[in-house]
């Protein structure tokens, strides 16, 4: 069965809104791995079904960032990038404790990125 891009993107956006309890989240096509504001960065889903879990992992980690990123402070330069990665790791850990399927998706995303 072929992957329906629109259905997958709508499902990812709906799931993110439900997890975060924020109906104001919107999707944008961006390479950003960390969401900015209330924007979920969605790329087109892969055409290969075995890569779908990694694509979902990219979405899951952003959903958890939007839900658990309570520290709004930013730092300049490289220190800010490191701080954001630490905040993302925290969000992934907290979210993965709630959703086992998302934990697997995030692991697949991490493998796919490296």
Question: What function would you assign to each model-found segment?
Answer:
Residues 1-114:
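Basic/hydrophobic alpha-helical interface regions
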């Amino acid at each position: 069965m072929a992957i329906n891009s629109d259905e997958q993107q709508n499902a990812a956006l709906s799931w993110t809104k439900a997890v975060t309890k924020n109906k104001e989240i919107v999707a944008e096509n961006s390479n950003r791995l960390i969401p900015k504001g209330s924007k979920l960065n969605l790329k087109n889903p892969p055409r290969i079904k075995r890569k779908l879990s990694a694509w979902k992992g990219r979405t899951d980690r952003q959903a958890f960032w939007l839900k658990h990123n309570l520290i709004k402070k930013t730092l300049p330069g490289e220190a800010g990038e490191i701080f954001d990665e630490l905040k993302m790791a925290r969000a992934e850990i907290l979210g993965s404790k709630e959703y086992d399927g998302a934990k697997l998706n995030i692991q697949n995303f991490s493998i796919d990125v490296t």
